[in-house]
């Protein structure tokens, strides 16, 4: 028996079937580094239009988690796809380096005894060490960027740039000093930004407290009475007993009705709607004597329960009827709404009582409670209220309360002298900041679109931005304040530039070591040099100034406006927010044209990731077991607009999908064996009809993919590429061409046509997957035939695809109909295999009973129909002649019948044909194979 295997064009490639990504990816990273891939991209892109994705800096602390990996991979997919689309898309990674978490780490490691200078020195060392660790992890994910020259907010140039950004805002009149309640953490000893606040359940003691009336006649008149017949009091309800010593007013709603209730011993003022629930809570019976509109009670004075001072009634719209008494006790130093209301009624800063110190302890001079920590003083305050007869009720409730994101301890609002960026303050020119920012939001594109309304609501309702902190590790606020007037030095902006120049050379230490006389000369003894540092959100929020037009100068020629900022949904109140405010203050527009928000990672059951639940996924572990490309494929396959589910099982599914794509690539490469595009590539018009369709289908898909990439719809890219590999290629085209590829002459038109199509498909596919499967695409690139440059990323989308000309007889619609017929035939062939009627598809002969239109279509393929259906014989018969046993199909006007071939099997092509053995020299093969071996070779026209 002759072995005809050597006469076949069998697939052959060195491209490995087994990916071995954990071992192979580091080798590819080394190659990218050795060829200077990022620098090469900058060189070839210098004359291209620019696309700037500005990196939101992760914090330089700890190992990266799955959220970091997701974020960086998304950014990398955009940068790579924009590069392929013909843009110069630089990517400068950055790090946020200052702030409390690093200072806290240093304190934990070295103790709190350190000097401020030593603290800063150790913080700088710690941040640098953390950056190196994170950088290695990000590079391992295949993220392409300027890793040798990232930006760091602690770089001297960036610290100086931040001071210059602040100077711009001072110059334009946005910055002011004020006393305002800010989020305060006793453990941090500092104000916190909104983004540093998280909410958790807390048990609090609630109290109902009676404030005796001081203006009895006015209260009587307000309720339409000649006089009061017995003692009267107004009742407040609060969850913060510790604020009672700082009470300075009582707030009621101007539109609510208030009742004067006779309870026997005294009269109580309560919101009419809450009388019943309050009396029940106090275990009292009573009757309403009179009612009055809230506005009628304005400015009536009541007495503090245990201090000799008055608390007037102020009207406030924020009072609610959901709980309590309808009366809110007001401590302007410890509540935002209280502060605003008291200021509206003319209270000046010097009149505001601030008995709580930065460590949470009352000042020693406070009667009854001096020297006590506020949380521990609560029982003593309740006892005092009970002692003076003011306590109506107390109970403990559990409610959501603000906590420090770092220490997990409860926060308070605390009025302190701080520096603010005014939201509604009139600048030297133009509109106030809030107005500017709201306009800028309208000019910004949001992905997903709901982000616009979210950010708009935050900006519309936010208070002034407190930018000062009382910490050591931060960029200084280099102000000199007059000792007598408290005013800024008249040359503040000029002095800030002098400080910035020094910081540029020596870092922030230059300010802290500066002797004021060096800048102020003889004036130095008249001014205080302040020690406050900037909110870290100001650090990252001004990177558009000190990175894009500063340390790295990667903005557009028209200015430092990025095309895209991309971060998690929490950054609407973080980096997106602070960047918007600084951009609008300095440049009067947002520093970005588009904002993309991604959701948070959850496990497959929708639960948040946490070490306690044991459901975290560590990027390093995935890299070392499955490979970074699997993680990248998961990112691409997941809709980032909501929560993103990830687990070991989900990643395993990504690995399965990866194998299908890799196997497709391997099939393409192995069937390009011996193909030299410079020698063997056919013109489109010389190719077979099916091959021309395959190239046309590839072109249509590429157009769709380019659009999906430009809109950042990576999950659509993934699904369409995966479906193309599995269905159009694996389930149709690649299956059909195997016979022609393997059995026809090595240099025949039939085979070269097929290889030309495979070459075009490969060139397109390798680029499609390059933004997602960064490592695998570059690996494939090395195995493609023909001369080529060093990396797929040094190219654009493939331009060698040709469209089917208009008027082509076998057009797209034609092949769609053929695919539908083939799917129906495959279904019946599978049934016959299951029933063991046939062993394989080539053992089948199929008769198609088709209506007139379909019959004409199928007839165009002639004898080549059998190659399309991958059966040994195929015939088309009029639909009316279908016998009873013919199988109906989902294709209208088509029935079919499959029978087992009665002919011998060709030992070379495996088709069952009547002419097997008809050639005496080759008794084991069919005449087609004989012709391909020793004759002119078969001629194919269609498939």
From Swiss-Prot:
The keyword Aminoacyl-tRNA synthetase applies. Binds 1 zinc ion per subunit. L-isoleucyl-5'-AMP binds at residue 567. Its cofactor is Zn(2+). Zn(2+) binds at residues 906, 909, 926, 929. A motif ('KMSKS' region) lies at residues 608-612. Its EC number is 6.1.1.5. It holds the Pfam family zf-FPG_IleRS. It is found in: Cytoplasm. It is an enzyme of class 6 (ligase). It comes from the Bacteria. The keyword Nucleotide-binding applies. Keywords: Aminoacyl-tRNA synthetase, ATP-binding, Cytoplasm, Ligase, Metal-binding, Nucleotide-binding, Protein biosynthesis, Zinc. One of its GO terms (cellular component) is cytosol. It catalyses: tRNA(Ile) + L-isoleucine + ATP = L-isoleucyl-tRNA(Ile) + AMP + diphosphate. One of its GO terms (molecular function) is isoleucine-tRNA ligase activity. IleRS has two distinct active sites: one for aminoacylation and one for editing. The misactivated valine is translocated from the active site to the editing site, which sterically excludes the correctly activated isoleucine. The single editing site contains two valyl binding pockets, one specific for each substrate (Val-AMP or Val-tRNA(Ile)). Belongs to the class-I aminoacyl-tRNA synthetase family. IleS type 1 subfamily. PANTHER family: ISOLEUCINE--TRNA LIGASE, MITOCHONDRIAL (PTHR42765:SF1), SOLEUCYL-TRNA SYNTHETASE (PTHR42765). NCBIfam families: ileS. This is Isoleucine--tRNA ligase. It comes from Pseudomonas putida (strain ATCC 700007 / DSM 6899 / JCM 31910 / BCRC 17059 / LMG 24140 / F1).
